[in-house]
Amino acid sequence: KALKPDLIIACYGINCGIYKPFDEERFNSYKDGLQRLKAKAEAKGAKIIFMTPPVYDKPNPKFNYDDVMKAYSEWLISKRKDSWKVIDLHSVMKKKLADKRTKNPNFKYSRDGIHPGTEGHELMSQQIINFFAVKPPLKDHQPNAYGRLLMFIRERMRVQRDAWLTEIGHKRPMKKGKTIAEANKIAANNTVRIQQNLETILKASN
């Protein structure tokens, strides 16, 4: 209600199975939750894009929790037939992980098997880029150009996230965010810097 987004990208699943073997009741709750989220988003005039959960890669001798994520992902992908917009992270990450491990058996996208690191997030973000049919420049012709770009993007995201979490009274343990007005001012300055860096990269790529 406070943000009034026009586009929502939602990724649920990795915590929804609560790290236990597949359970039909939990699975139905997951499906019901996403269907209700979609209905509420569209009722407010927002478009919604779902992403399948990323790979779970933490060994467990008792059962393979990633099989639960696979089931959740397959259901989400099946909803494309009902005109749901779905970006598949799970199968892409699983295939890439297997490919990487043919050369390095110890390769990981995530240190804890749950939260992807930089390379994992890069692969995930590329699937979003592919969904929107945006072709990024292939080479970084300017030293640290992408690094500077990412720095400004992260700062814009961080300050707005913390401001809104504080504004809506979220109970998440965190430092108090800035006011919305202060955050928007900082975000606007970062947007200018982001655009400047993008223009530099694009010019160098032509």
Please give the residue ranges for each predicted region.
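Extracytoplasmic/secreted cell-surface and envelope-processing proteins
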Residues: 17-22, 58-61, 96-97
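Substrate-gating cap/lid alpha-helix
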Residues: 58-90
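Conserved catalytic region of serine esterases and O-acyltransferases that act on ester linkages
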Residues: 82, 102-206
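Glycine-rich anion/phosphate-binding loops
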Residues: 23-35
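Mature catalytic domains of secreted/periplasmic carbohydrate-active enzymes
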Residues: 1, 26-28, 118, 122-123
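A short helix->loop->beta-strand "cap" motif at the edges of active sites that frequently abuts
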Residues: 39-47, 84
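Proline-aspartate-enriched helix->loop->beta-strand connector
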Residues: 1-14
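Structural beta-sheet core signal
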Residues: 10, 50-51
